[in-house]
C-alpha cells in the first residue's frame, strides 16, 4: 500500500452552529450574525433624538460606559448589576441620584448574566455559577462557587442565559439548543429549569424551547411568560420569534415544529406540531426577541399597567431588517387576544436598512421608570412619563 500523500487534506471543519440548516442555494449569502460593538459610546455621542416614544414619554441616557450591556438586576442601596455576553464582564452601577458610576465586579467569564435576591448577586455563565453575598456593602467579597450543583451543559451556542427568581423564590434558568437546527445530543438542552437558590431541587419545567433569553411573571396570574427565538435559514418571513406562557411539562416544538404550527423541513417528524404549546403572540421573523417585563408601576398611564414590554434586538438572518425596538404585547391575562404594538422605535431606518442601536433588556425601577439596555452602544436608557 502506498504512503499517504503529505498533501492529503484534513477533514473539513464542521460548520459553525449558526450556519446549520443553511440551504445550498444560499451558500454564498452574506447574512451572518452581527458582531457586537465592544466599546462604550459616550452619552453625548448617542443620537438619542432619533428615538421615538408615545406622547408624554421621554428618554435619557441613564448610564454609559457599560460595553455590551444586557440583563439588569437591581440590588440594594442604589446598586444595579449588568451582565454581558462576549466581553465576559459583570458591571456594578451605583445610582447617586443625579449621576451614575460603574465598576467591573468580575470579568473573564464566558457569557455571564445576573440575578439578585436577599442581598446576594448571582452570576451564571456557560460554565460557572457564583454567588456574591453582601456585595452591596462589601464590594470585594469573594464569591461562593455553586457550579457543581447546577449540572451545566458545556455547549456555548445559545447557552447565554437570562436568569431570574420567580414569585416562588426559586431560580429559573434556561438551556438553549446547541445549534440553529438539530436533534440535540442529549436531553439537557432546549429546556427551562427551576432550582432552589443553592442549586438543589432541580426541576425541568419545559422542553422544546429553542432559545429563550427573556421571561417575567404575569402580575395577576403569576404565570411565567417567555420569549423564544425561531430557527434561521427558512427565508425572510419564517419562522416567527414567539411569546409564550409557561405550562409546566409542556413541549414547545423544537426541533421539529416552529411557532406552534410550522413543521421543520430538515428535522422531520410525523404530526410534528401535534400537542405543541401554542404561542401567545408572533413577534416577527428573526426579530431577536429578548428581554421581557410586565409593567406594574404607577408612573406610566393606567393603560400600560400589566402590559408586557419586549425588547427586540434586531435581525441578522433576513434581507430586510426587523426589530431594533421595544414593543408591547397587550393581551388578556390568559394570553388570548394578543396584539403587538410599537413603543420605543427609531434605532433603525427602513429606507436604507441602517441601524445604530440594539435594545436588549428591560428593568422597571422603583419609581416606575423603565431602564432599557442597548447592547450595541454600551448604554442604558431611562424611559419616564410626565403629563
Report each predicted region and the residues it spans.
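A detector of repeated loop/turn-to-beta-strand junctions in beta-rich toroidal repeat architectures
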Residues: 87, 126, 140, 186-189, ...
